[in-house]
Amino acid sequence: MSRAVRPIILAIGGHDPTGGAGIQADIETIGQLGGQAVTIPTAITLQNSHQVVGFEPVAAHLLSQQGRMLLEEFPIAAIKIGMVANVENCEAIQALLRPHPEIPLLIDPVLA
């Protein structure tokens, strides 16, 4: 008996150290819905479960490199974008996704 292949969802967003939001919450949600998550962090947030006091963006070139590696290896079924930490990351994400218009995209902006 063969196992069903789980759809692979690329989650792009911030790292919430409490797991209540960001890519940690995306991983949990995607798994509960039967998918497999692969992730690209856009920022490390400075927070606890009561407050966010700041964030540090991930360098755009690192985001781009990680994205290319994941898109080359995995058959991405959909992409979810959450927190985009700065303009440079927004441009890197746009360049990364431009060659893949066939992949469904969900945008859930956190900071605008």
Locations of regions flagged by a protein language model:
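Small-residue (G/A/S/T)-rich helix-start motifs and N-terminal tracts that mark the onset
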Residues: 1-78
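Conserved beta-alpha-beta core of the PfkB/ribokinase-like small-molecule kinase fold
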Residues: 78-81, 85-112
